[in-house]
């Protein structure tokens, strides 16, 4: 059933980065349920293809279009936006969800690990934002929306050393979203910018961060009832369903039992 306020987005196009699992997959599914055309991108698209088939079998009114894209490569990103332009006219909603964490501390971490996180969490997000805005501008889209899936780590620094550089990239996302809001205002457009900052969400995140210690990864999710990816997707739908004159700048959400 279409959510109140989502009718105006029906048949319009949303780009969701990092759509192969976790929050990205949940967001892509929720948007298809609301009748949108969704381009879901990731480095590997097998999971997105399966999700697209599930959405079709379920009879959802929208469509999920898998697209292979390495977000650490600017040429890949530009090619994706070019393909969206030629095949679907352009992007109306950009959801920068893709993120990367490496267990590289500030005192002994590898430069390559830092670069990997910065390239995906900051640069790719910024490139997608720029290209999405240009796509909207060239088609005179004045009601588009750019949503950055951030983290509570972008608002406070946790004590775990393996998350400190990642936290720095998420602080950057907080600043970039507010800077984007200001620039959109200066451009005299009604395109909106929103940051959604979840706390602990039960995904593969901890298993990728602690890939050498799956026991520690599992323990991350066992001590409290975590958020689900669908909870974050629900926040995305809420933001999109607000009237065009309403600017939701940031949603900070965490499990009820999470302390910080």
UniProtKB/Swiss-Prot annotation:
Q: Which GO terms describe its molecular function?
A: 17-beta-hydroxysteroid dehydrogenase (NADP+) activity; 3-beta-hydroxysteroid 3-dehydrogenase (NADP+) activity; estradiol 17-beta-dehydrogenase [NAD(P)+] activity; nucleotide binding
The yes or no answer to whether the keyword Secreted is present is yes
Identify the CDD domains for this entry: Mgc4172-like_SDR_c (cd05343)
Kindly give the InterPro entries that the UniProt entry links to this protein: NAD(P)-bd_dom_sf, SDR_fam
Summary of activators and inhibitors of this protein: Inhibited by flavonoids including apigenin, luteolin, genistein, kaempferol and quercetin and also by carbenoxolone, zearalenone, glycyrrhetinic, curcumin and flufenamic acid.
Compartments, as annotated in UniProt:
Secreted
Q: How does it assemble?
A: Homotetramer.
What does this chain do?
Catalyzes the conversion of the 17-keto group of estrone, 4- and 5-androstenes and 5-alpha-androstanes into their 17-beta-hydroxyl metabolites and the conversion of the 3-keto group of 3-, 3,17- and 3,20- diketosteroids into their 3-hydroxyl metabolites. Exhibits reductive 3-beta-hydroxysteroid dehydrogenase activity toward 5-beta-androstanes, 5-beta-pregnanes, 4-pregnenes and bile acids. May also reduce endogenous and exogenous alpha-dicarbonyl compounds and xenobiotic alicyclic ketones.
Listed name of the protein:
Dehydrogenase/reductase SDR family member 11
